[in-house]
Amino acid sequence: MNELQILLVSGKPLFITIDGFRQAMLTVFPSNGKIVEDKSDIKVVCGFSQAEVDAYLKEHTWYQFETHVALEEIKKVLAQDNDTSTVTLTDEFDDEQLPDNSIAYHRVWGIVTADSNWWFSSKQLAADLQAAEANPQISCHFLHINSPGGEAWYLDRLSETLCACQKPILTFYEQMCCSAGYYIGCHGNRIYALTDNDYVGCIGTMCSFYDFEPYFEKLGIKRVEAKATNSDLKNKTFDDLRHGKDEKFVHDILDPLNVQFLAEVRSQRSQLAELPDDAPVLRGETFYTPQAVELGLTDGSHTMQEAIAEAVTMGREYIDANKLKTAIYNIV
């Protein structure tokens, strides 16, 4: 089983929409029973030869390669627009040979996992943010999100990294920026959707999994379990949940994660901080762009080119502000 399959059947708390969970289950456990584990047989991808793909994958994860391919396609679009044709959008965050005012491209696509080679990784994003922060040629972070959410674990550490960034962050999402996706995206100094029909929100915490034991029993597969005399509480909370008694699991596990989630989005979005606890937006509701703007979840809609151009402006303002600080310090 790959990392995403293991996560989905683990019973771990997830920041994800119901539809996102179903989509993920169908993706990694397809109804035809054919699960493709090995992606290395791709001959040519968007102009990359097999040798180039192999060389890239020696130092990068598969997800980073997918991001690199996506970035190359975005660059082609930017090159056709006068306002963005000279912009340097990069995923090589350590490269100090980049032009001044380069923009770091961070892609948050699909299910959020903490640590994965095939899928988006919260740990990898944290490392990428730190690398881009340390590179003087990079002036702004561009978060490109299309995610229904995912794994809750490690998001608190990723949030710390995002909050510690000195360089501005622009969040740009398309289709959906939900649950764990919004946990990440809310750290943008500005947040934009691609269209009026993009989904955003689903701020909340849930756990969802399938109980296969009755099915296994029909196949004659019986689960046997024994606990030491003084280990009566071992896995009890989870077992109670599986048998329909969810009170302790909700109180001890889901509720604390949810408090953390709500505190984070309220600290990043001032309009959300002013809302009462029982506001629908803080109880897991999801919204299209126009209503999301009214609620303060997002700041409007932009084309990709407009969002990139604004990121360039934010980066330039950051550089100018730093130059002014340096000049003042030199005078003092």
Where are these regions (language model features)?
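N-terminal organellar transit peptides
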Residues: 1-197, 203-332
